Amino acid sequence: MTVALGKSSKEEKNLFDIADDWLRRDRFVFVGWSGLLLFPCAYFALGGWFTGTTFVTSWYTHGLASSYLEGCNFLTAAVSTPANSLAHSLLLLWGPEAQGDFTRWCQLGGLWTFVAFHGGFGLIGFMLRQFELARSVQLRPYNAIAFSAPIAVFVSVFLIYPLGQSGWFFAPSFGVAAIFRFILFFQGFHNWTLNPFHMMGVAGVLGAALLCAIHGATVENTLFEDGDGANTFRAFNPTQAEETYSMVTANRFWSQIFGVAFSNKRWLHFFMLFVPVTGLWMSAIGVVGLALNLRAYDFVSQEIRAAEDPEFETFYTKNILLNEGIRAWMAAQDQPHENLIFPEEVLPRGNAL
């Protein structure tokens, strides 16, 4: 008789295995290890934003009303950046600025750093969530890689740019009109629209929108009508073995339209991934350059000629003058502590400009 010796299959699970089983269990909303970062950070970031836009003024940091309580609406409310005098302080509630006083912390702009950092880590948690789920179901990680692009833009605009400047004050506030103002600031002080990295970003985003529209329309146009259902959702079984649209027909169509067309689905879809992700990454790199005050294209010869010849003007020289007007108006408004004084003749004339 043979006796088999070995460990019992019913070994006691350690704490890590128990936590892993619970976190990665198949449920309606997947939690996962990434959820330990994502859910708390997203909760606090959104909660801080809703609290700030509802109740908190920007009077002490920007001299502005910025909450629903003060009469703002969804487009004009914001969680505004801390004052310039606070530089790059983390503005912790228990720090030397607020000293545990929640009201003072809100007045100083503490909610902005709270929302910015929790929001940044929340986005990273969401990317890790995509990695984790992809690994669990044996998918490639391209979704997570693609999501790195908006994370790069967020981190560069909200964190790296103000770190390169004198303080968080120069980051965008979290609000619709506030971000519009930040865009105008970027144009006036950095000539952002003439920056090659911005140009690549625009090409990426608009090119991706065009590709998405073309791709969706082409697939709709070449669907196989192999079912008797009244619409696409009834006509096709999600587990069917055959493809639902004709790549050959699509290729022939676009070959006739443009003379060239994608003949490979992998290359087509990789290109749709590559265009927007690369565009957003280029924009993020450009903003890092602005943090270091790197300049955009300068056509100095045109500026010199325009200064010498009143009859010579280009769209570029007109834009340069417009940027000077933006700087003259915004600097005095946004930085009253600097006591900037500009001659009356260079300032805009009221609502009529």
Swiss-Prot record:
Residues given in the record as chlorophyll a ChlzD2 binding sites: 118
Top-level EC class as recorded in UniProt: oxidoreductase
Chief place where the protein resides: plastid
Annotated positions binding Fe cation: 215, 269
Top-level taxon of origin: Eukaryota
UniProt entry keywords in alphabetical sequence: Acetylation, Chlorophyll, Chloroplast, Chromophore, Electron transport, Iron, Magnesium, Membrane, Metal-binding, Oxidoreductase, Phosphoprotein, Photosynthesis, Photosystem II, Plastid, Thylakoid, Transmembrane, Transmembrane helix, Transport
UniProt-listed Enzyme Commission number(s): 1.10.3.9
Annotated residues for binding of a plastoquinone: 215, 262
Transmembrane region(s): 41-61, 125-141, 153-166, 208-228, 279-295
Residues with PTM Phosphothreonine: 2
Binding, pheophytin a: 130, 143
Protein's cellular compartments: Plastid, Chloroplast thylakoid membrane
Thylakoid recorded as keyword: yes
GO molecular function: chlorophyll binding; electron transporter, transferring electrons within the cyclic electron transport pathway of photosynthesis activity; iron ion binding; oxygen evolving activity
Catalytic activity: 2 a plastoquinone + 4 hnu + 2 H2O = 2 a plastoquinol + O2
Similarity section: Belongs to the reaction center PufL/M/PsbA/D family.
NCBIfam families in alphabetical order: psbD
Additional record remark: 2 of the reaction center chlorophylls (ChlD1 and ChlD2) are entirely coordinated by water.
Function noted in UniProt: Photosystem II (PSII) is a light-driven water:plastoquinone oxidoreductase that uses light energy to abstract electrons from H(2)O, generating O(2) and a proton gradient subsequently used for ATP formation. It consists of a core antenna complex that captures photons, and an electron transfer chain that converts photonic excitation into a charge separation. The D1/D2 (PsbA/PsbD) reaction center heterodimer binds P680, the primary electron donor of PSII as well as several subsequent electron acceptors. D2 is needed for assembly of a stable PSII complex.
Descriptive protein name: Photosystem II D2 protein
Gene giving rise to this polypeptide: psbD
